[in-house]
Amino acid sequence: MKSMFKLSALFVAMGITALGVAPVAQAATAPAEKATAVLVHGAFADGSSWDEIIPSLHAHDLKVVSVQNPLSSLADDVAATRRALDAQTGPVVLVGHSWGGMVITEVGNHSRVQSLVYVASFAPSVGQSINDLAKDYAKPSGLDHVVVDKEGFVTMSFEGISQHFAQDLPVAKHRLMTATQGAIRGAAFDEKVSVAAWATKPSWFIVSDQDRMIQPALQLDNAKKISATTIRVRAGHVPQLSTPKEVIKAILDAAKLNNE
């Protein structure tokens, strides 16, 4: 009996030891979660404006969310983007095109956001609106081709889309973009940001040298102000469609920062 008791005690001891080891194995560090690219479109557009780059981002094992902004106010677009950020579980590269730069500047202090990518965009300081940013630069030619409805919402004519917004894309794309564009409330261009997320988050900036909607000089000055990694492209206002490789690379570079 004593031998059996000793053997049982040995087995119990071994069991206790095994139980002690198991939690250590389970506590092994899990692989870092891949970043999600949250894409924020601009005025006169919708979430499909990112269609050219989304498959490549997926191919590089990034998750992607393309926000559908209501374009009814800065606050409404920030709320839509914040909901998308709240739904993520890992680090986020927050990307904004054109007016979307206002949105990511305001909401980019979200805890999930690790880096910002501005694409032919605005990067305001606290207390600045788009009209504040643009007042010291020549009026872009594209702004002569906007249509304002009786409720103050603004769209672009086909001529504006084809000759000034996306002059470096084929005519079939012009027709599609004109048909699917989002109308933005004109008063939004006077709305000011209360946060400048770029002050605390690493930033990238795609500057479009042939932009006819936002002066390239304004883009360059904004990129310099925020100390962004700056990439210049020979493109119109939608480089994510006309020169997608450069935009994809900037997003991937920002994502690598998250996964180091």
Where do the protein language model's features map onto the residues?
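Bacterial N-terminal signal peptides that target proteins for export
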Residues: 1-11
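Bacterial N-terminal signal peptides
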Residues: 9-20
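Active-site catalytic motif of lipid deacylating hydrolases and related acyltransferases
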Residues: 30-89
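Gly/Ala-rich beta-loop-alpha elbow adjacent to hydrolase catalytic centers
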Residues: 95-100, 104
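Flexible "cap/lid" loop of the alpha/beta hydrolase fold
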Residues: 109-113, 117-158, 185-188
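Active-site nucleophile elbow and catalytic-triad environment of alpha/beta-hydrolase enzymes
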Residues: 176-198
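Short beta-strand/loop motif that positions the catalytic acidic residue
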Residues: 205-207
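Conserved loop-alpha-helix segment in the C-terminal half of the alpha/beta-hydrolase fold
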Residues: 209-235, 241, 254
